[in-house]
Every structure is written in C-alpha cells, then in structure tokens.
Amino acid sequence: MVRLLISTGEVSGDLQGSLLIQALQREVERRSLPLELMALGGPRMQASGAELLADTAPMGAIGLWEALPLVLPTLRLQSRVDHVLKQRPPDAVVLIDYMGANVRLGHKLRRWFPRVPIIYYIAPQEWAWRFGDGGTTQLLSFTDRILAIFPVEAEFYAQRGAKVTWVGHPLLDTVSVLPDRQLARERLGLKSGQRLLLLLPASRQQELRYLMPTLAKAAALLQQRDPSLEVIVPAGLASFETSLQKALEAAAVRGRVLSAQQADELKPMLYAAADLALGKSGTVNMELALRGVPQVVGYKVSRITAFVARHFLRFRVDHISPVNLLLKERLVPELLQDEFTAEALVQAAIPLLEDPAQRHEMLEGYWRLRQTLGVPGVTDRAAKEILDLTKP
C-alpha cells in the first residue's frame, strides 16, 4: 500500500491535481500497487478518487490585504489536517503550485517526516519574478524533486542545485483533440456570423471584486459596437455564480453565466467557438493559447497590496501572462493595475475581433509557444516519477 498526500489550492490547482490523480491511478494499476490518496484540494480531486482532507479551492488570495480574511479559516483547516497526518503519515508528498501555503506545509512535513520524499509539481514561478533567490532557497530546503512544466523552469532550478525532471505542460494532455468549431457554435446556440466573447475573471474570490466589474463594463461597450455579440461567463466555482450574474446585470450586459458544472462540461466547446477572451492572468492564458483563442489579459489587486509590492518588496516582473513570459515578448495585450480599465480592454480587443492580420499574428505566436511545451503524456510521466520516488 502506498499512501500519498497531494496538496494544492484554488481552481486551477484542483484541476491539475485531478489530472495527476487520474494518471497515478493508471500507473498503480499497471504496477498492481494499492494506492491511498489524501488531498488538500477541491471537488475535482475528490471526484477523481482522492480523500479530501480539506477543501482549499476557495482559499486562494494574492496580496497581504486580500489574504487577511483567510487567516483564521486557514489556521483552523491546518489544525485539522495536522491531526490527520500525524495519525496517517504519508509515504510521499506532492505539492502543486499554491506557493505560500505549500511552502509552509513543506517545511512542516520535512521536520515531521525527514525521510518522506517531497515532490513539487508545478513549482512557484521564481524564474519569472525579480524577488531575489530567497524564495528559491526556501523551496529547495525541503524539496527532494521538482517536476518542471516549463524548460526555463527546469533550467532555473537545476542551476540552483535542485534535482529536476522536465515533464512538460499538463494542459497538453487536455487539448490534443479539439471539437469542430461549427458544431461547437451550434451546440452553444450561436447564429451564423455571431461573435462569441468569453469573460474569464476569477479563480479566487478577490478577483471577482477587482476584475469582474471592469470586464463586464468592457463587454457592454463591445456590445454597443456589435449588438449581436454573445457574452458567456463560465463560473470557476459554484460560489461565484451569483456574483458573476450580478456583475453582468450591473453593467447591462446581455450574456450568460454558466454554472461551474456546465463550465466543466462545455469548456472544449466554449474554446472551440470563441472569437475572443478577456480575462485574468494565469493558467487560463495557457489554455486559451493552446486552444487558439485570441485574448486580452488583465490583473488588479488592492492599492495597499500594489504599493507594498512596488515600494517595499521591490516586486518586478517583465510580463504577467505566462504566454508572454515564455515567449519573452508582449504577444498578448496586458493591462495591469491602473491600466486595467474597460476602455483599455476595448481598445485592445477591437483589433483582435475585427482585423484578421492581428488575429493571425497572435495565433502564429501561439504556435511558437506550443513548440516549447513538450509532448502529450505529461501527467503519466509525472505519475511515474512520483511513484518511482515513493517507498511504501
């Protein structure tokens, strides 16, 4: 019997965790090895077969101010999880993204279980941030192996002494077969010639507050220009659905909010049918790129967090979208903090909706990006590495 603990947070981490769990189940079946999976994650990981010790999907926040409401819930959650892990120690630990919480957990588990391998899959993007090497040093102090999803990530951590395996980007396993665009448009009820705009605002509660009103206002302005424009907003979590609907109504947008369940079921159809997406920075940018959807990216945090990051932490980053970070160019328009306005979103969106040359340029850049990400079979390679490192 092998007992694994997988820890992640937020909507994107829950998705990646569920894909890894499915790959682990395939690999243990091949090895005829009994497997017990414990998880800090979300409903997708639970549905894939893990025992959910705590639901961390709603717990993500970026910024000091934004994280304050989560302090007490997080402490209560940690206390419950600590009790379980002391009663049922894992044979290996897999950390997925979710930097702050997973770094704290990694340090704790290294103290408690010195011989248990700790594997970081989808490690923090230290290679992209100009913060110095303090965070990297912390991460390497408790990590036995990093399973890197980007070549630049693998090189960065290897140069600093980590044991690294580059497995490729896990989204490659989910986009190998795309639905037919015309069939997808018919399934979504789109008329001939009608454009589809996706709004993708949030995998964290704070992002609903800071991003969605501006995205909705931009959608309303675009509908003034093209009254037939269809707007769809897929909910990342069921708890987001009401807030998303209210934001559309407040901006007088004619559009639909898809429930979290509908969003999961229809995601390939949405991407196949979409003409443009406006949304937050993060994993979704990579998914849009791999599915060939032109996009405009924005992000905003509280003024307090922005001030602290700029003036005290000296936070600097060349790009906020992973697409641009990997290509080392501004292929995807980015609007950060005060630049993130409805008018600026519209100005960036119009060429992508109306100029075929602009669309072609972005799609060509997506193709170049795709060549750097490896080949499908990513989660199977990650599962094999994890089990090879695990000693029951």
UniProtKB/Swiss-Prot annotation:
Reaction it catalyzes: a lipid X + a UDP-2-N,3-O-bis[(3R)-3-hydroxyacyl]-alpha-D-glucosamine = a lipid A disaccharide + UDP + H(+)
A Gene Ontology term for the protein's cellular component: membrane
Pathway(s) served: Bacterial outer membrane biogenesis; LPS lipid A biosynthesis
The UniProt record lists the keyword Transferase: yes
EC number, UniProt record: 2.4.1.182
Pfam families: LpxB (PF02684)
BP-aspect Gene Ontology terms: lipid A biosynthetic process
Keyword field: Glycosyltransferase, Lipid A biosynthesis, Lipid biosynthesis, Lipid metabolism, Transferase
Superkingdom of the source species: Bacteria
Gene Ontology MF term list: lipid-A-disaccharide synthase activity; phospholipid binding
InterPro entries in UniProt: Glyco_trans_19
Biological role: Condensation of UDP-2,3-diacylglucosamine and 2,3-diacylglucosamine-1-phosphate to form lipid A disaccharide, a precursor of lipid A, a phosphorylated glycolipid that anchors the lipopolysaccharide to the outer membrane of the cell.
NCBIfam families hit by this protein: lpxB (TIGR00215)
Record-stated family: Belongs to the LpxB family.
Protein name: Lipid-A-disaccharide synthase
Gene: lpxB
